[in-house]
Amino acid sequence: MTRPTEAEPVAGGGSEAMVAISDPGEVGRATQTRGDRLIVQLGNLFAWLFPLLMVVIVAQVALRNLGRVGVGPGNQAWMDDLQWWIYGAAVLVGVGYAVTTNSHVRVDIFYDGFRPAKKRRYDLFGLAWLFLPFVILCWDITLTYALQSIASNEGSSSPNGLHNLWILKSFVNVAFLLIAAATWFAYCRLLARLTWPHWWKRLLFALPSVWFAVQLAIWYAAAGATILLTEAETLRDATRTAFFDEVELLPGQDAKITVLVALAVTLALIGLAYALRDRSKDGVRGPDAEAA
């Protein structure tokens, strides 16, 4: 693993004086967007949860051991739950911070020797074709958990634990939206290092992620409309309507109608963005492409 660093001149230190910046949130700050800065600031804020977590852990250990000798209230179940709450919140926000600052774990055996343009292409593929679809999938899965937890007013498994567990599960779902936003901001920033980031390029070069997101939007919109306009009362009932069926494309090869509609909508959006692009920026290359 490598730690991001950046050398900058020291004010008044002469032409050769340099200082190394090792704070991941400050490395490359000049190229970060407002969205990037928001993610970094949230990461810095939630990082303070780790010292709090240490205090809670130490306090729980002390209470547990003192309780064994008859001193104090002993082990507190709510403090056990609190540790997971704090850890979960800090780590999930930290994932978005790591994506924005490129401070996640990476084995640099090959990557470190690549030219800047090749590095950016690998980064773009990893973010938009591998990581972002996974994050969107996690959001979709945890949405069901969060809604079920809210509906049942889920609490702790321990009578003395932290109840209202739906708060944590809802936060997990929202955190995946934050991670998705951080990934998109980083993707757009890196794309600008290679080429002018027209919207049609942003959508096309992130096709799996965009297609998946559009498909989910269509699926939930159609399910909601079905519940409102028909006798369907649940998502299970709504998804039994014809719009959610499969069609045969080839012998033995079926596809969901919602997936095909999402593909058509995605391609239409890309085409519209291409038609409305700023043609004066066609052919503009980013700094890393120029360096290649």
Report residues per predicted region.
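Alpha-helical transmembrane segments and membrane-interface helix-loop junctions
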Residues: 2-113, 117-292
